Amino acid sequence: MEDYGSYSTPLTARYASAEMSHLFSREMRINTWRQLWLNLAIAEKQLGLTQITDEAIEQLKAHVKITAPEFEIAAKEEKRQRHDVMAHIYTYGLAAPAASGIIHLGATSCFVTDNADLIFLRSAMDLLIPKLVNVINRLSQWSLRYKDIPTLGFTHYQPAQLTTVGKRATLWIQELLWDLRNFVRARNDIGFRGVKGTTGTQASFLALFEGDHAKVEELDKLVAKLSGFDNVYPVTGQTYDRKIDIDVLQPLASFGATAHKIATDIRLLANLKEVEEPFEAGQIGSSAMAYKRNPMRCERICSQARYIMNLIPNALNTASVQWFERTLDDSSNRRSLLPEAFLFTDSVLKILLNVISGMVIYPKVIQKHIRAELPFMATENIIMAMTKHGASRHECHEQIRVLSHQAGRVVKEEGGDNDLIERIKNTPYFAPIYDELDSLLDASTFVGRAPEQTESFVNKDVSQALAPFKSMITEEKVDLAV
């Protein structure tokens, strides 16, 4: 039964996926600790520690998944000892009595806490990467669909030379491809802390193996291998270096900037009524203004993306205050920092995929906006056409300048339509090109190589970048909880 009387994070209740929420759950955390304790015992036994029996290993295996009653036992024990790891060693030992004396043998708390965190970081990246791949894939399809639709370009959020709807989306895709590269790189760089002891010297393990350095080195590698890692950090303090957290979170923050930019562009286009995010049949935009269709999904992306971007200073500060071999300044901070970074990123990817999958454009509105600006943009072409008929460029420029300013006053001071072309048609000076004006105002002639650039980029660059992830691509519909 849900507890309505205490705070619960909206991340799990409203936004993040079930699989990401489960990854950072208490159950997954303790199950991972138990698996690490099992891996350590297996490796130590394999390397000759006779105090670890077959029965101990079998009992550890049989109880590697924690039960609800065991959580209650651990909670009571933690309250008594004020130490979560020791509480769970005690609880695991009750379930596996033959192993109670060898659980955590030679290890320090960071053997389970830090190695588990590294497992979670890598697993979380494994959940994010397919979602980012699908965002890129669907946006690429959308880009190709609208590669030939002219639209106003904007610089300084003022109308500029035309581009196409699809070409604009390639700018978003390119940033997302860089994010994908960064995600994969960060994921593959994550190593394993291994078995390093209280200050990273492996002294306790050297004592266990009676000074056999080779066995200690082999233990480090074997536990890492059993835990799914080939790369073990060669040196650590008590913890793995907190700069690793920075390296993992930085790509998430960078993606947050990408997502914020994309969502902001869509919001601005929604204001112009050119593009719209999905809007459900029963969705309400405002409790007071019944007509409103607010871009709430893109607003949510921006809200959550800002949170992701602002986590980096926290990670930097945490890394900077790790004195010598470690301090505990990091512990409670990272309990929130790491899960929230991934839960928010997961949520943003989920919303972004939902928006892209249902995003629509309104070509007639786009054309209306082009008609309002294109006459001004076409003036250079008109001047060139007149010079081909023998007109003076300087004189033609002056004629266009006067008429443009007149038309501009109509638009700005009277709220009228841009009538520059009508003024040109009513000016005898421009009679030599009357028959050419319609072709000179064909919007498709103002987009340069935008359609070709879009097609080439998607079919070559994007296709090549997504090739290693082909098996991850799906057409699955993405629904939001709210």
Curated annotation (Swiss-Prot):
GO biological process terms on file: 'de novo' AMP biosynthetic process; 'de novo' IMP biosynthetic process
Its EC number(s): 4.3.2.2
Catalytic activity: N(6)-(1,2-dicarboxyethyl)-AMP = fumarate + AMP; (2S)-2-[5-amino-1-(5-phospho-beta-D-ribosyl)imidazole-4-carboxamido]succinate = 5-amino-1-(5-phospho-beta-D-ribosyl)imidazole-4-carboxamide + fumarate
Positions annotated to bind substrate: 14-15, 82-84, 108-109, 238, 300, 326, 331, 335
Keyword Lyase (UniProt): yes
Pfam families named among the record's database cross-references: ADSL_C, Lyase_1
Gene Ontology cellular component annotations, sorted alphabetically: cytosol; nucleus
PROSITE patterns referenced in this protein's UniProt entry, alphabetically: FUMARATE_LYASES (PS00163)
GO molecular function list: (S)-2-(5-amino-1-(5-phospho-D-ribosyl)imidazole-4-carboxamido) succinate lyase (fumarate-forming) activity; N6-(1,2-dicarboxyethyl)AMP AMP-lyase (fumarate-forming) activity
Pathway as given in its UniProt record: Purine metabolism; AMP biosynthesis via de novo pathway; AMP from IMP: step 2/2; Purine metabolism; IMP biosynthesis via de novo pathway; 5-amino-1-(5-phospho-D-ribosyl)imidazole-4-carboxamide from 5-amino-1-(5-phospho-D-ribosyl)imidazole-4-carboxylate: step 2/2
Gene3D superfamilies named in the record: 1.10.275.60, Fumarase/aspartase (C-terminal domain) (1.10.40.30), Fumarase/aspartase (Central domain) (1.20.200.10)
Active site: 156 (proton donor/acceptor), 286 (proton donor/acceptor)
Keywords: Lyase, Purine biosynthesis
Superkingdom of this protein's organism: Eukaryota
Assembly notes: Homotetramer. Residues from neighboring subunits contribute catalytic and substrate-binding residues to each active site.
Family: Belongs to the lyase 1 family. Adenylosuccinate lyase subfamily.
Name assigned to this protein: Adenylosuccinate lyase
Gene: ade8
